[in-house]
Amino acid sequence: ASDTEPIGTPLVLAVLDEKQALSLEPNEQNWHVLRRSGFGLSNRDAGMYAQALALANWHESHLYCSRCGSATEVIKGGWARRCQSEGKELYPRTDPAVIVSLIDDQDRILLGSQGVWEENRWSVLADFVEPGESLNATVEREMFEEAGVQVSDIDYLGSQGWPYPYSLMLAFTARVRGDQKH
């Protein structure tokens, strides 16, 4: 799919396990992982990919009702599930998370890395929004927890759906507060 295809063009996205994928295309070099190839997608295509993967992840993790443990069934074209015992309808959720470009007084940006990542993989800092917490409070908390600094000049940049597992990433910039040594 591309942004040049007419609105209403039918598209089908499927999440395949390795065996299914290799039966369609045996050359593993022709398959792309979203974390590596997603940057080259248009906004529309990235959104569709994220939506499909988030829904697939949600379905896989909600086969049973969280209230009573009974099996659930897919309803509403895959946009919901229903508990087969209680009839309760379950809907996919979106977990808000902030991702922050933290900039110091010399206009340097702070990058972090996780021990489980491959060597030389870096990212700006991110964390989920806690229940009852504002987005700005999340930025302030996360920058203090991860970098040990207080921040100012918090500015919202934009958002993007992210299917790991079903997040809405809310991007911000923030500055290290000027009265701190770092």
Regions found by a protein language model. Name each.
Residues Q51-S101:
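Cys/His-rich short segments
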Residues A80-S123, F128, Q150-V151, D155, ...:
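N-terminal strand-loop-strand
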Residues E28-W31, N43-G47, H62, W122, ...:
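Generic signal for short, ordered secondary-structure residues
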Residues F39-N57:
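Short, charged surface segments at domain edges that flank catalytic/cofactor-binding sites
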Residues A50, F128-V129:
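A generic structural signal for short
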Residues S2-G40, V129-H182:
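Unchanged
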